[in-house]
Amino acid sequence: MRYLLSAIFILGASSAMSFVFSNIDGGNIDTKKWEGQPFLIVNTASKCGFTKQYKGLQKLFDTYRDDGFMVLAVPSNDFKQELKSNEAVKDFCELDLGLNIPMTQITSVKGNGAHPFFKWVEKEKSFIPKWNFNKILISATGEIVE
């Protein structure tokens, strides 16, 4: 049933402003709130050679958030390089790296269990993350920027 509802939702999604993620702090992150703003969604991992890119994502967020640009980190263990719990990811990112960018709970980004946003990206652009720290830039109108 979950997959059927997910498929129905994806077929109806016409822009990136149609998705809700679970916030690592609890509650939800609704991309509809970012309507009219560009944003970057990045699948991340704490134990990856690319983890150092978090620093650049934080700088990007700090530089442009007052202009309405958002950055969303989506921790994923799809490539077996993420910590085992949301709490561990949150502590690592906040305490060890000093990050305060918006972040989801650990989320699947590929395969049958992928979050509806990533299924939508696959449908729209035939793009599936092949590794950690893939960046998906969304325009202020909710379209994927290539």
Segments from the language model and where they lie:
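Sec-dependent N-terminal signal peptides
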Residues: 3-12
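A short, compositionally biased
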Residues: 13-18, 130-131
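Amphipathic alpha-helical repeat scaffolds
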Residues: 43-47
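Structural microenvironment flanking redox-active thiols in thiol-disulfide oxidoreductases
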Residues: 50-114
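A short beta-strand-turn-helix
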Residues: 19-38, 59-64
